[in-house]
């Protein structure tokens, strides 16, 4: 088994694309994400905090089998260019839109699910 120095040296020699592939492989193997944890301030109301939530994030968890349709739907919903929309879909799970009112978030979720995507509202 390789020691820590050998692993670090191997990583230093990798290209950005190789490092990206390595991160994805580690995420899949261990069921983790490379996203930095977000600190959440505690709500004063406890159970009332859930009832008071007015803004929701729409997260694409999977593009499903109709990736092209999902890319088009994401492009349309976000106003991104085709390349950026494709990168966002390829990088799923990713937040598509943030801080939406509940009705808009549910509408976007419905639109994306109609084209085969798996979506969560958070």
Swiss-Prot record:
Gene Ontology CC terms: cytosolic large ribosomal subunit
GO terms of biological process kind: translation
Alphabetized InterPro entries for the sequence: Ribosomal_bL12, Ribosomal_bL12_C, Ribosomal_bL12_C/ClpS-like, Ribosomal_bL12_oligo, Ribosomal_bL12_oligo_N_sf
This protein's record includes keyword Ribonucleoprotein: yes
Highest rank taxon of the organism: Bacteria
Keyword DNA-binding: no
GO molecular function, one term: structural constituent of ribosome
Alphabetical keyword list: Ribonucleoprotein, Ribosomal protein
Summary of subunit composition and partner proteins: Homodimer. Part of the ribosomal stalk of the 50S ribosomal subunit. Forms a multimeric L10(L12)X complex, where L10 forms an elongated spine to which 2 to 4 L12 dimers bind in a sequential fashion. Binds GTP-bound translation factors.
Function: Forms part of the ribosomal stalk which helps the ribosome interact with GTP-bound translation factors. Is thus essential for accurate translation.
Xref: PANTHER family: 39S RIBOSOMAL PROTEIN L12, LARGE RIBOSOMAL SUBUNIT PROTEIN BL12M
Family under the similarity heading: Belongs to the bacterial ribosomal protein bL12 family.
Protein name, entry field: Large ribosomal subunit protein bL12
Lineage of source species: Bacteria, Bacillati, Bacillota, Bacilli, Bacillales
Gene: rplL
